[in-house]
Amino acid sequence: MTDRQGLLTDRIALITGASSGIGAAQRGLFAREGAAVVVTARREERLAGLVDELRAQGARAAYVVADVTRSEDAVRAVEFTVERFGRLDAAFNKRRHGAGRTPLHLMDDPVYDDIMDTNVRGVFNCLRPEIAAMLASGAGGSIVNTSSTGGLVATPVAAPYVVSKHAVLGLTKGPAAEYGAHGIRVNAIAPGTTRSEMVADWFAQNPDAEELLHRATPQPRTAEPQEIAEAAAWLCSERASFVTGSTLVVDGGFTIL
């Protein structure tokens, strides 16, 4: 038998929000599956350490510091990827910001604006240069946006977070329809409760939340970032070659009840 070829062998991937949580798990998995990866986030020290770790394992990896809520930063991240590796084949857009459980009628405008800028504008800013790069290469590509179960049902978080994650699904279906004929696939993942810095903070502020969520989930536990990363890697691979405009729910069954 020959060695198994990685899902993403010889592909060039850009991963945003890669300094922690799902994004950090993603860069490791993509590299192990054979991709050259460019990781981006706001924390340079964390990114540099992640890239050093990947290179020590024999992966092709680079990083660029960027805040994708700024359109020029998103453009720069894509341009860096193309300059460094020659093209862009796959992109994983992951930015997430919530606001605890602040009641809607008590929420200030800046909180709403911050959530929408991070969760929606950040995806929009990434999609434009990513799609442009894939069109320029003529080889198509695959983009995966990160929504959440909050994009499917009303979850026990602030209303603007639910709104923003529904919007991400629109930013998935629209481009999927518009660019499918160009060989560009756009899908979304909708993770359930997943261990990350943000979720850990939320659990700390709401001590009973994790147990309550487990009771409402057929698989009564919190997902590990690696489990979410596996779903996104499949969507970015040619094994999902006829999948576009879809949302892959990775929530242990939370939304089926």
From Swiss-Prot:
<comment type="similarity">
    <text>Belongs to the short-chain dehydrogenases/reductases (SDR) family.</text>
</comment>
<keyword id="KW-0521">NADP</keyword>
<dbReference type="InterPro" id="IPR020904">
    <property type="entry name" value="Sc_DH/Rdtase_CS"/>
</dbReference>
<keyword id="KW-0560">Oxidoreductase</keyword>
<protein>
    <recommendedName>
        <fullName>A-factor type gamma-butyrolactone 1'-reductase (1S-forming)</fullName>
        <ecNumber>1.1.1.413</ecNumber>
    </recommendedName>
</protein>
<comment type="subunit">
    <text>Homodimer.</text>
</comment>
<feature type="active site" description="Proton acceptor">
    <location>
        <position position="161"/>
    </location>
</feature>
<dbReference type="Pfam" id="PF13561">
    <property type="entry name" value="adh_short_C2"/>
</dbReference>
<dbReference type="InterPro" id="IPR002347">
    <property type="entry name" value="SDR_fam"/>
</dbReference>
<dbReference type="InterPro" id="IPR036291">
    <property type="entry name" value="NAD(P)-bd_dom_sf"/>
</dbReference>
<dbReference type="GO" id="GO:0016491">
    <property type="term" value="F:oxidoreductase activity"/>
</dbReference>
<comment type="function">
    <text>Involved in the biosynthesis of virginiae butanolide (VB), which regulates the production of antibiotic virginiamycin. Catalyzes the reduction of 6-dehydro-VB-A to VB-A, the last catalytic step in VB biosynthesis. In vitro, can use various synthetic A-factor-type analogs.</text>
</comment>
